[in-house]
């Protein structure tokens, strides 16, 4: 099931675009999987891709991309505690807000690169009692708002599970929101809330139905808050699930991801 309007495909054919995309959803719905597969598909089309790991609890995205985990970007600003101290003094936001970034500006020590895909990480929780993730959220909020893309560049943000990032204002800096839905009541309910939040900040959003089977496809489609916003249905693929389980680089090229890629390039 794909919403891929032929009019827009023809209208935008050959047009160079740039886009910042937030990939959202509940924990375990497949955000990292879709982000990885989409990044690879865009890169195969000659686009320059920045993947932003914005989930402090996720230790698998870099492996799905076949890369090493990059150094925490928060360290570039002196580390979590330094950022928190500056936040208390209202220095950090003022300083960082005035600084614009491009993909080329990201210091080499803070990204991994493979096959046209550059990966950066806001930061991870590395040990017990080290504090909250507010510093990483502040860094990402300012970074994505001040990131300037060139033609044929895409930034894909693999967001933390849930909707806290909306409260932090991170999504204000993106151009489009992808909401991943798995076959569960919790995922469907959260996707409705994310859709409402997206509309409240005037951001276009689309649904990706994930882990779809013949038995649940119709049920999922009918249960979605706004079915006209369903972009694609991604079938439950044993090969993808197996590679993810073993922490291997994803090698599959699902038709649904190819269709999603063409759809995003058309809007």
Enumerate the predicted regions with their spans.
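Short, Lys/Arg-enriched N-terminal segments with co-localized hydrophobic residues
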Residues: 2-18
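C-terminal lobe/tail of nucleotide-utilizing enzymes
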Residues: 6-7, 196-267
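Walker A/P-loop phosphate-binding motif and the immediately C-terminal alpha-helix
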Residues: 20-54
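Gly/Ala-rich phosphate-binding loop of Rossmann-like dinucleotide-binding domains
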Residues: 43, 171, 199
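N-terminal phosphate/diphosphate-binding loop that engages ATP/GTP or pyrophosphate donors
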Residues: 44-115
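Cytosolic-facing regulatory segments adjacent to core modules
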Residues: 98-110, 119-157
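Conserved beta-strand segments of the P-loop GTPase G domain that flank and frequently precede/overlap
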Residues: 121, 179-182, 208-210
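Inter-motif core of Ras-like GTPase G domains
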Residues: 148, 167-184
């Amino acid at each position: 099931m794909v919403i891929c309007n032929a009019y827009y495909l023809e209208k935008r054919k050959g047009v160079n675009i740039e886009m910042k995309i937030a990939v959202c959803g509940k924990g375990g719905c497949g955000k990292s999987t879709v982000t990885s597969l989409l990044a690879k598909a865009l890169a195969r089309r000659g686009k320059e891709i920045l993947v932003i790991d914005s989930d402090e609890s996720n230790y698998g995205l870099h492996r799905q991309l076949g890369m090493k985990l990059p150094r925490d970007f928060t360290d570039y600003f002196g580390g979590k505690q330094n950022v928190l101290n500056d936040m208390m003094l209202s220095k950090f936001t003022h300083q960082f807000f005035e600084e614009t970034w491009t993909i080329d500006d990201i210091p080499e020590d803070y990204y991994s690169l493979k096959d046209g895909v550059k990966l950066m990480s806001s930061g991870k929780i590395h040990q017990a009692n080290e504090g909250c993730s507010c510093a990483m959220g502040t860094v990402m909020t300012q970074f994505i708002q001040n990131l300037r893309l060139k033609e044929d560049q895409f930034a894909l943000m693999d967001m933390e599970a849930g909707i806290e990032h909306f409260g932090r204002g991170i999504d204000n800096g993106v151009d489009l929101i992808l909401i991943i839905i798995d076959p569960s009541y919790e995922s469907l309910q959260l996707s409705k809330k994310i859709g409402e939040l997206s509309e409240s900040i005037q951001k276009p959003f689309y649904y990706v139905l994930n882990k779809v089977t013949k038995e649940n496809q119709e049920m999922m489609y009918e249960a979605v808050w706004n079915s006209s916003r369903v972009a694609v249905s991604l079938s439950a693929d044993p090969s993808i699930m197996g590679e993810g389980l073993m922490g291997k680089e994803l090698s599959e090229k699902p038709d649904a991801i190819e269709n999603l890629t063409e759809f995003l390039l058309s809007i």
